A protein has these predicted regions:
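Extended catalytic/binding region for NAD+/ADP-ribose chemistry, centered on the ART fold
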Residues: 47-80
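Active-site and NAD+-binding cores of ADP-ribose-processing enzymes
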Residues: 1-47, 78-211
């Protein structure tokens, strides 16, 4: 589990990234600018813990709507995806909404892009292009980076499922209160304009959309 940590050579790059206008898909029970405090997530880089052992709330976002949708609505799409089904009713049951973030200034994010990983002796296929079996190792890496880089406000990488989009995971305790807001109230991912993007992704993936 610690092999990724042991492989790190030198300090990671801290990228200055403006996330103003970025997108997140999240359960409707959370506000658009709320950090997720759940200890039950089973994601590549979360949950993480603070020094006192409590769960660190985090926020995921992407710079493209397609990236945000692929990492949520399509997260369980099989590979190969051609011929698979996506049920509209299943999306509706999850009560997912889309929010657009507003943030006034750049954030300092640990660069886990291909170049950022290469800088420290890691590769994309060790950290990003991995399945859930490897999540304990990638979470341990994220925990290590969070603890060793107190100036970092989150992580930055290229989406595994939509590699034209950048993704971030932000640390709640390093973002000033009310520093991040939303441009408008959240809207359902089944609102016509957003659902059109879902159907376009379905077409790209060769899937069938069952309404």
């Amino acid at each position: 589990m610690d092999e990724l940590i042991a492989a790190i050579q030198g300090p990671p790059h801290l990228a200055q990234v403006t996330i103003d206008g970025w997108w997140r898909v999240h359960p409707g029970r959370y506000a658009g600018d709320a950090f997720n405090p759940s200890p039950d997530s089973d994601a590549r880089f979360s949950p993480l813990k603070r020094d006192d052992g409590t769960v660190l709330p985090v926020m995921y976002a992407a710079d493209m709507i397609e990236g945000a949708l692929m990492e949520t609505v399509f997260h369980e799409a099989p590979c190969p995806s051609a011929g698979a089904h996506l049920q509209r009713a299943e999306i509706e049951a999850k009560s997912l909404v889309l929010s657009q973030l507003a943030c006034p200034a750049p954030l300092s994010l640990i660069d886990l892009s291909s170049t950022g990983l290469r800088r420290v002796g890691l590769a994309k296929n060790q950290v990003i292009d991995t399945n859930a079996v490897h999540y304990p190792a990638t979470r341990a890496l994220a925990q290590h980076l969070y603890e060793r880089m107190p100036q970092a406000q989150g992580l930055l990488w290229m989406s595994r499922l939509f590699d034209r989009s950048r993704s971030v995971m932000l640390f709640a305790d390093r973002i000033p209160a009310q520093y991040i807001g939303v441009t408008a109230p959240p809207r359902s991912v089944l609102e016509a304009a957003v659902e059109e993007t879902i159907m376009d992704l379905v077409d790209q993936l060769g899937m069938r959309y069952l309404s």
